[in-house]
Amino acid sequence: MSKLNYIKGDLFSHKSSASSILAHACNCRGSWGAGVAAIFKKQFPSTYKLYVEHCKKHASNPSGLLGSTYLIKSESSDPGNSGRENVAYVACMFTSDAFGRRKNSADDIVENTDKSMLHLESQLAELAKTEPIEQQDGVNVVNMPKINAGLFNVPWEETEAVLKKHQVLINVYVI
């Protein structure tokens, strides 16, 4: 079972001696135009470019990305890496096909979050074999805001319940 730690502060100020994993919920349409995604775009522009390319590759069936996570190593030149010993990884969790009025239902978003976390866990297990990623007591650490609770409008308690099922430590940043 996952442990969730709530941290009052800015997700983007999180630092670790190893590479940090910064996760957020994404749409499958290649848009980080609002909410925390817009901040990710500003802090880690190299990852935004790769995210857009990834979505374009799946443009014929964007919903095929649902329930997956695209884990992207950022570049040292990204503003979000200022002051970091190792560059951050951005985990794009595809929880809704679209956004705005076309976003998926809350139930679908929660189900896709569960699948995205499973995908992320398997990627982190492999990555930890070759890269120094943030861990606590041998458990991989993921840092995130209250995903899905903003523009996707999913009650946090529903996402929280799913996150608690997973085998990672999650630092949830709240303002």
Curated annotation (Swiss-Prot):
Keyword Membrane: no
Residues that, per the record, bind substrate: 9-11, 25-27, 32-37, 147-153
Enzyme class: hydrolase
GO biological processes: peptidyl-glutamate ADP-deribosylation
Pfam family, one: Macro
Stretches assigned to the Macro domain: 1-175
EC number: 3.1.3.84
GO molecular function, one term: ADP-ribosyl-[dinitrogen reductase] hydrolase activity
Source domain of life: Eukaryota
Keywords for the protein's UniProt record, in alphabetical order: Hydrolase, Protein phosphatase
Gene3D superfamilies: Leucine Aminopeptidase, subunit E, domain 1 (3.40.220.10)
CDD domains documented for this protein: Macro_Poa1p-like
Catalysed reaction, written as an equation: ADP-alpha-D-ribose 1''-phosphate + H2O = ADP-D-ribose + phosphate
InterPro entries according to UniProt: ADP-ribose_metab_enzymes, Macro_dom, Macro_dom-like
Entry-linked PANTHER family: ADP-RIBOSE GLYCOHYDROLASE OARD1 (PTHR12521:SF0), PROTEIN C6ORF130 (PTHR12521)
Task performed by this protein: Highly specific phosphatase involved in the metabolism of ADP-ribose 1''-phosphate (Appr1p) which is produced as a consequence of tRNA splicing.
Family membership: Belongs to the POA1 family.
The protein, known as: ADP-ribose 1''-phosphate phosphatase
Lineage, broadest ranks: Eukaryota, Fungi, Dikarya, Ascomycota, Saccharomycotina
Name of the encoding gene: POA1
